[in-house]
Each structure stands twice: as C-alpha cells, then as structure tokens.
C-alpha cells in the first residue's frame, strides 16, 4: 500500500510539473482571446490607426536621431563590457546569462543531476587549487644586502614588493621564534626585530641582541622527576642576530659568509643543548624545533654562499650532508639547490639520481624538477636534432621522449620558455614564488638559463617544440593533460609578488570575445551611417539607391553565380574534358 501511495504521489507530482511547464502557452492563448473579446471597449482599431498616422508623420531626422541614440547607448554598453572584461577577465553579459538566465531556462537541471556523482571530485579539485595557489619560499632566493640592495643602489628600482617582504617577515617569525623567547633577552629583542618594517631598525636590534650575550643567567636543568639542580651558564651568542646581519647588512657574499659562520657556531651550540632537553616538556620541544630550523637555515645559506663564490663542489657536499642529517625538513627544498649546483658541475648522472628520488607523483612538482628532467632528455638528442630531418623521417624514440618531457614541463609552467628563449627580459627573482606562475618561471630561468645554453641544441629543440603543448590542452583552465587544470589565481598573486616595472606574463592569454568585437564594429558602422545621413541626406539617399540597384541587378546575380561555380571547381579540382583524337588510316 505504501509503495502504491508513493507511486501515485510521484505521478501526480510529474503531472503538475508537466502542466506548469506548458502553462505559458495556455496563458498566451488566453490573453489573445481577451484581446479579441475586448477589442471594441478598448478601441484597439482606433488606437492602431492613431499609431500608424503618427508613424507616417515622422521625418527622416527622427530615424537618424533614433539610430544615433541607440548607437550611443550600445557604445556605452560596449565600454562598460570592455572595462569589466579587463578588470575581472570575464564578460559581464556572459556571466549574467550563465548565472541568472540559465537557471530560469532550465540549465541547472543538467548540472544538478551530476552533482552527487562529482562531489568528491570537486572537493579534490578544490583542495588541489588551494595547494597550487599557495605561495612558497623561493629556495634560490638572493641575499638582500649583498644582491637586492646593490641592484637598488645601481638602478634606483626596488626589486622586492612590500607583499613579498611581508611574507618573508612572517617566515622569519615562524622559523626563528618560539613562545619561550621572552626568557632570553637576546631572543626577545630579535622577536621584535623580525616584526620591524624599517631595515635600519632591524639591523640596530640585531646589534643590540649581540651586545647582551655576556649576561649570566641561572638555568634550571631537571635531572629526574624528584630532584633538580641549578647551574650557572653563559648565555650563548644569538644566532638569529647573525642571520639578520648576514642577510641585510653585509654588502658582499664574502661578508655574509663570515657572519653565517659565526651564526653556525652559536646555532650549533644552542641546537645541541636543546636536543638534550627536548623531552623535558613542551617548552623545551618548541625551543629544539626552533633551533633546528635555525641550524638548517644557516647551513643552507652557507652552502649557497660557497656556490656564489665558485666553490661548487664544497657547496654540493654541504647540501648532501644537510639532506642526510635532516631528511624530514623538506620545506626548505634543498634538493633544488643541489640540482642547480650539480648542473653547474655538469654531473648529469648525479642530477638524474636526485630526480629519480624527488620527481615522484606523491611529491609537489616544481619548475626546477620538470624542466631539469626535460633538459636531461633533450641533452641526449639535441646536438643532432634538425626540424627538417625530423619532418622527413619522423621522430625517433629518444626524440619523442625529449619532446614529451618538454611538453610536460611547459604544461606545468608555460611561462618558462619565453625566458629561456630570451623572448622576455629577466629580473631579479622574488623571495617567494607561486608554483606554475610567472614568479616561479623567473626564479628558475634566472639560475638555469646558463645550464640550457651549455647543452648544445637544447634551446633549439625547446624553440621548435614548446608551443605544441598548447594544442594538447586547448582549455587549460578547465582540463589539463598530465597535471591538474591551470589555476586561475596565478596572475593576481604574481602581480603582488613581482615589482611594478615588470610586465607579468599571463596564461592563458585573455582575448576579447567575438561578440564584443562584432558589437563594436556594428555600433561604429551604424553611428557612421547615421552621422553621414544627418549631414548629407541627399547624397546618402543617392548612394543607398545605387547600392540597391547594384544588388538587385541581373549582372550582379550572374557574377555572383559565376564566382560560386568557379570556387566550387577550384575546390573540387574538376579536370578538363578530354579532347577527341582522330586517327588517319
């Protein structure tokens, strides 16, 4: 009984829905019937005759004014549409049509029927888009005092944006501070220094923190749960103060290296002490975590100093030791520093070994990993690659692998080839990058352009094949080939990360929709005709009659038909009729 009642209700519901779907036709015929019945009381015939009389008395100037007014309104709508498209990257009319008119016309039903099946996929894609739009610390970032500031002194331009430096300040507070900093005077001063916006105030605070390292303090060291001892120790020198001075005050890489070595001595002592006490409470555990971050940062920057000063083998050894000592600290992306140093040494076998470990599907990709893999594949075939020969005989297996690797890299970050091929000028890389964005492309090309130039024919192979990637992903914002769809947020984030004098690369390139161009041309042509008709009514009348006579003439129709037949013959390539041959006896 319950099932029968449910079936009856479903049928009744479907009948009601069907009746409401076609109810507008009933209303339409009902309105027509009312108009026919009330035609005499409403004096419809008299009103129609009055309207026709009014239209007959209108002069051509009225129609010209009406046309000009409509063209003006259309032009204003066009200007607003163009402004909205430039600002938000989408058409206002299209957005209103999709968002508001489509649900009224029943377009939501198709999407809602699949909503339950695609809910998990949507959540996964949302999580992926959030992770791809995350801003990452640039593993190859330069030194502020020795490199960024020197660029400012020479050119007068600021290579870093306020947003980028603010992110760096947040990173420093996360890595170099903890809740127990107020117990040590030097760390308390540095905690305030990392929040300071003025560079000179930060440097002064770092010097002040180093001046109080001779203060003695009583440090309580618990041995067992039932007893404690008290011992007097000298407060160690503040390692984070040396870090700040090396980053911002040192004007050369050599000076920065000296300060980082002093920071290493102080940071190593703090790390060993906190390592022994890390299990005695959450406070000591937080101190050990902070000291670990400080030590890893110092060793990594020392390796980068050695790389800058030409001691590349020493830098490679320091990076390998650091990765073995702290294998879980992947947030610094030390393997990207190692890849760049190994490419400088032309140790391509070691580069391949590092890629085999980090070019994994479970790890986040980067332009360094994708383009380094493409460079190694291209190195095997680039010296003998020729576009003409490849078009004649086809691509070999090795060449196909190299082209696929280039397509994979270009799909991940399509901005890099323009910098590697020197189609766009490079600037100093920012301190933070957005993966798959223009900022990451600048950071990669700034350090790896020399490695691509060193491999003979690699840039030629890249030049011949990189644009073929876009044929495989005609709609990159909706669907990718090997990666997730390209994130929409890259342009906005890159504009905040990169300086204003740099022209941000945009992908995919926004093009004006066809209907905007068509509307612009139609409005312009109509306004021009209205203006000419108003100024020269007789001449435009003669011109209009002449055009009508031309289009209505028999010669024009014959010429049009002949042109159509000639075009069809050209497309079909109809051969001429064979000539008859006569044989003589």
Swiss-Prot record:
Matches recorded under InterPro entries: ST7
Glycosylation positions in this chain: 47
GO cellular component: membrane
Compartments reported by the entry: Membrane
Family stated for the protein in its record: Belongs to the ST7 family.
Protein's UniProt name: Suppressor of tumorigenicity 7 protein
Pfam families reported for this sequence: ST7
Keyword set, alphabetical order: Glycoprotein, Membrane, Phosphoprotein, Transmembrane, Transmembrane helix
Transmembrane region(s): 15-35, 62-82, 512-532
Residues annotated with Phosphoserine modification: 386
Main location: membrane
Organism domain of life: Eukaryota
Coiled-coil features, chain-numbered ranges: none
Gene name linked to the record: ST7
PANTHER family in UniProt: SUPPRESSION OF TUMORIGENICITY 7 (PTHR12745), SUPPRESSOR OF TUMORIGENICITY 7 PROTEIN (PTHR12745:SF10)
Protein topology in the membrane: Multi-pass membrane protein
CDD domains: ST7 (cd11557)
């Amino acid at each position: 009984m319950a099932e029968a009642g449910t079936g009856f209700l479903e049928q009744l519901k479907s009948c009601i829905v069907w009746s409401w779907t076609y109810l507008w036709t009933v209303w339409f015929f009902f309105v027509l019937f009312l108009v026919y019945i009330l035609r005499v009381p409403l004096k419809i015939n008299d009103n129609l005759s009055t309207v026709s009389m009014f239209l007959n008395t209108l002069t051509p100037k009225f129609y010209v004014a009406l046309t000009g007014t409509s063209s003006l309104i259309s032009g204003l709508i066009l200007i607003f549409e163009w402004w909205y498209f430039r600002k938000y990257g989408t058409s206002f009319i299209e957005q209103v049509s999709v968002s508001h008119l489509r649900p009224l016309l029943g377009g939501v039903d198709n999407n809602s029927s699949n909503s339950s099946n695609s809910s998990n996929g949507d959540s996964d894609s949302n999580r992926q888009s959030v992770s791809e739009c995350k801003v990452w610390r640039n593993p190859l970032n330069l030194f502020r005092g020795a490199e960024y500031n020197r660029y400012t002194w020479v050119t007068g331009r600021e290579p870093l944006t306020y947003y980028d430096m603010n992110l760096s300040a947040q990173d420093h507070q996360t890595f170099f501070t903890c809740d127990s900093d107020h117990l040590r005077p030097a760390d308390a001063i540095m905690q305030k220094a990392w929040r300071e916006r003025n560079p000179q105030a930060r440097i002064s605070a770092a010097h002040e923190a180093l001046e109080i390292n001779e203060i003695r303090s009583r440090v309580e060291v618990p041995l067992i749960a039932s007893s404690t001892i008290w011992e007097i120790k000298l407060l160690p020198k503040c390692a984070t103060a040396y870090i700040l001075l090396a980053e911002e005050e040192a004007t050369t890489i050599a000076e920065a290296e000296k300060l980082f070595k002093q920071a290493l001595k102080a940071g190593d002592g703090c790390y060993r002490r906190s390592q022994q006490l890390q299990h005695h409470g959450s406070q000591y555990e937080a101190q050990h975590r902070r000291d670990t971050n400080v030590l890893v940062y110092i060793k990594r920057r020392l390796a980068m100093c050695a790389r800058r000063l030409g001691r590349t083998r020493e830098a490679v050894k320091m990076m390998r030791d650091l990765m073995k000592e702290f294998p879980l600290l992947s947030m610094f992306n030390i393997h990207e520093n190692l890849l760049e140093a190994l490419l400088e040494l032309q140790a391509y076998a070691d580069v391949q070994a590092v890629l085999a470990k980090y070019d994994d599907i479970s790890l986040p990709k980067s332009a360094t990993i994708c383009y380094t893999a493409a460079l190694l594949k291209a190195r095997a075939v680039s010296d003998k690659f020729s576009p003409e020969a490849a078009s004649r005989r086809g691509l070999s297996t090795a060449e196909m692998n190299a082209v696929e690797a280039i397509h994979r890299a270009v799909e991940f970050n399509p901005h890099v080839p323009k910098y590697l091929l020197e189609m766009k000028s490079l600037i100093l890389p920012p301190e933070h990058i957005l993966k798959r964005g223009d900022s990451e492309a600048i950071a990669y090309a700034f350090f790896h352009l020399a490695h691509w130039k060193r491999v003979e024919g690699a840039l030629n192979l890249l030049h011949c094949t990189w644009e073929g990637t876009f044929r495989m992903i005609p709609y990159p914002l909706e669907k990718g080939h090997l990666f997730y769809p390209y994130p929409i947020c890259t342009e906005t984030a890159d504009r905040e990360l990169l300086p204003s004098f740099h022209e941000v690369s945009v992908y995919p390139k926004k093009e004006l929709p066809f209907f905007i161009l068509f509307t612009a041309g139609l409005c312009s042509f109509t306004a021009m005709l209205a203006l000419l008709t108003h100024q020269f009514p007789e001449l435009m009348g003669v011109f209009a009659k002449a055009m009508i006579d031309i289009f209505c003439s028999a010669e024009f129709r014959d010429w049009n038909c002949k042109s159509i037949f000639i075009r069809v013959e050209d497309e079909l390539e109809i051969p001429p009729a064979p000539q008859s041959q006569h044989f003589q006896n």
